[in-house]
Amino acid sequence: VDDLIATGSSLIEAVQALKKAKAKSIRAAISHGVLSGPALERLDKCKDLEELLITDSIALDNHKKHPRIKVLSIAELLGEAIKRIHNEESVSSLFD
């Protein structure tokens, strides 16, 4: 779990460390998929990463799509947060 993936180097290092520690399955969850520079090429070469979950907080261009990337929508969460802020209600309970 990380806040963002830019070039992917930190993610690849983490995957390699997990593989070295004999992890049976490796998946990653990243909040913001920047995916700049060599990120997709690195992801392509990193066969030990089974799945990369990212949110749609940053739209993925078609050329950044990858078979092991799954994009999760945060639209409902953001909408509910905006509604609660507007109604002066708590947003912290969204994350309990």
Question: Which residues make up each language-model segment?
Answer:
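PRPP-associated nucleotide enzymes
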Residues: V1-D96
